[in-house]
């Protein structure tokens, strides 16, 4: 099979239609212009420079509501690590979501916008004393404990009954990239169910007078496409509930709901998930004669990924022996996911069509592995100065950005109803030097 057969748009002329399911809700083409939140992409690039991470507020809010509507009886917790940004935390708070944070830094962002403390969960396999003290000082609703050492430390620091959940490793294969498979045995997260550590952790929490066990937590992985994985995790954790002899009020199944990054990749079946997990939970609890706990879920990527689009300016085009390289003014400092996980993206040239051929889009950094997208169809006459748009960049882009090669991180620009505003400003050379002594 040829590349043209694999990528039907290769060789076509004219401007391609927007790929279904990849762009923010309401994105449209108007007289050749790509409109994001009603704002032309060319205007965004001119006003805010490139690279520029654009975030559509309406899409974030709509995705948050979709989870609440699918599971109205459950607690929906936004995984704050996906996009730690004050405005995003405000938006999800407005939509009734709770928030999980993994550090005193993420908690500081939540505090700065007055996020209700009772709706905050503290996560992480390592929580420093500073993290725990910050959480206790703010009065976070729950702490998800992840090690025996942490149970002792938290028990010693907490002055009153602090609600906790025990993170369980259910031993379920999520069928995803090994770097984000967190529910399998023999890895750093949680207490092993099969090895007996999970039951021991429950008993140790109960023994701590300053801690109150309210629930169990598990997270099977990221980019999980199969609902059956969550069903099996729920069944296994209910088995622990039945054996521990302690009333468990909450069962948090974590997040990891897959989103499409490329044309043709399907959406996660949220409706099917809601129905099948309810049935599995009810059936297993009835079978084991334990009360059905309240369900919690923690979508992060599934709330913000599609809301994001990154704009890059083409800096150079090089024609190699076998490939055409299109080099842009960003790269692995604003998107390390291709280097970390082999992630793939679609790319669009803004405001110009033409006959297309496969190219490799590469970044500006001093690494051969700084590749943003391979074998993507772009117009054959792509040239320096062109504007490229990459969709599905709302999750783990701003969060994972670095200063490699002392390059400042790009801004995050929010768009809604034809209005654009800076949510996080571009990092400057002065910012980079400020920490030097």
Swiss-Prot record:
- Output the InterPro entries linked to this UniProt entry: Ala_racemase/Decarboxylase_C (IPR009006), DAP_deCOOHase_LysA (IPR002986), De-COase2_C (IPR022643), De-COase2_N (IPR022644), Orn/DAP/Arg_de-COase (IPR000183), PLP-binding_barrel (IPR029066)
Q: Which HAMAP family does the annotation name?
A: LysA (MF_02120)
Record's catalysed reaction(s) = meso-2,6-diaminopimelate + H(+) = L-lysine + CO2
Q: Which residues form the signal peptide?
A: none
Task: Report the function annotation for this chain.
Answer: Specifically catalyzes the decarboxylation of meso-diaminopimelate (meso-DAP) to L-lysine.
Q: Which residues form the active site?
A: 366 (proton donor)
**Which keywords are on file for this protein?**
Amino-acid biosynthesis, Decarboxylase, Lyase, Lysine biosynthesis, Pyridoxal phosphate
The EC code for this enzyme is 4.1.1.20
Required cofactor names: pyridoxal 5'-phosphate
Root EC class: lyase
Where is pyridoxal 5'-phosphate annotated to bind?
256, 298-301, 396
Tell me what this protein is called: Diaminopimelate decarboxylase
Gene Ontology terms for molecular function: diaminopimelate decarboxylase activity; pyridoxal phosphate binding
Q: Which organism is it from?
A: Actinosynnema pretiosum subsp. auranticum
One family name in Pfam for this protein = Orn_DAP_Arg_deC
Tell me which Gene Ontology terms the entry assigns under biological process: lysine biosynthetic process via diaminopimelate
User: Any idea which residues bear N6-(pyridoxal phosphate)lysine here?
Assistant: 81
Pathway per its UniProt entry is: Amino-acid biosynthesis; L-lysine biosynthesis via DAP pathway; L-lysine from DL-2,6-diaminopimelate: step 1/1
- Does the keyword field hold Amino-acid biosynthesis? yes
């Amino acid at each position: 099979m040829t590349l043209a057969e694999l990528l039907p748009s290769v060789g076509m002329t004219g401007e391609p239609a927007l790929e279904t399911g990849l762009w923010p809700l309401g994105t449209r083409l108007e007289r050749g212009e790509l409109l994001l939140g009603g704002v032309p992409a060319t205007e965004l690039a001119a006003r805010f420079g490139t690279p520029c991470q654009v975030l559509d507020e309406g899409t974030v809010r709509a995705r948050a509501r979709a989870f609440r509507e699918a599971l109205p009886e459950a607690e929906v917790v936004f995984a704050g690590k996906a996009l730690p940004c004050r405005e995003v935390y405000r938006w999800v708070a407005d939509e009734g979501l709770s928030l999980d944070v993994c550090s005193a830094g993420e908690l500081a962002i939540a505090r700065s916008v007055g996020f209700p403390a009772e709706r905050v969960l503290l996560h992480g396999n390592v929580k420093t004393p500073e993290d725990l003290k910050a959480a206790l000082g703010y009065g976070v609703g729950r702490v998800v404990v992840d090690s025996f050492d942490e149970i002792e430390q938290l028990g010693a620091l907490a002055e009153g009954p602090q609600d906790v959940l025990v993170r369980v490793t259910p031993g379920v294969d999520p069928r995803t990239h090994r770097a984000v498979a967190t529910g399998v045995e023999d890895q750093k997260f949680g207490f092993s169910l099969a090895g007996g550590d999970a039951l021991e952790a429950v008993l140790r929490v109960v023994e701590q007078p300053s801690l109150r066990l309210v629930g169990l937590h598990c997270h099977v992985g990221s980019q999980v496409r199969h609902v059956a994985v969550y069903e099996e995790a729920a069944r296994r954790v209910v088995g622990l509930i039945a054996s521990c002899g302690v009333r468990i009020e909450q069962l948090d199944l974590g997040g990891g709901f897959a989103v499409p990054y490329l044309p043709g990749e399907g959406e996660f079946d949220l409706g099917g998930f809601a129905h099948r997990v309810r049935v599995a939970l009810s059936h297993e609890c009835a079978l084991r004669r334990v009360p059905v706990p309240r369900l919690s879920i923690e979508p992060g990527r599934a709330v913000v990924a599609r809301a994001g689009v990154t704009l890059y300016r083409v800096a150079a085009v090089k024609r190699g022996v076998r490939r055409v390289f299109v080099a842009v003014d960003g790269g692995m400092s604003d998107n390390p996911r291709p280097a970390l996980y082999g992630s793939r993206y679609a790319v669009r040239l803004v405001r110009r069509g033409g006959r297309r051929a496969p190219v490799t889009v590469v970044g500006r950094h001093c690494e051969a592995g700084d590749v943003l997208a391979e074998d993507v169809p772009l117009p054959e006459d792509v040239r320096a100065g062109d504007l490229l748009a990459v969709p599905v960049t709302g999750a783990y882009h701003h969060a994972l950005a670095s200063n490699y090669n002392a390059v400042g991180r790009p801004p995050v620009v929010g768009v809604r109803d034809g209005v654009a505003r800076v949510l996080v400003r571009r990092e400057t050379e002065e910012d980079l030097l400020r920490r030097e002594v």
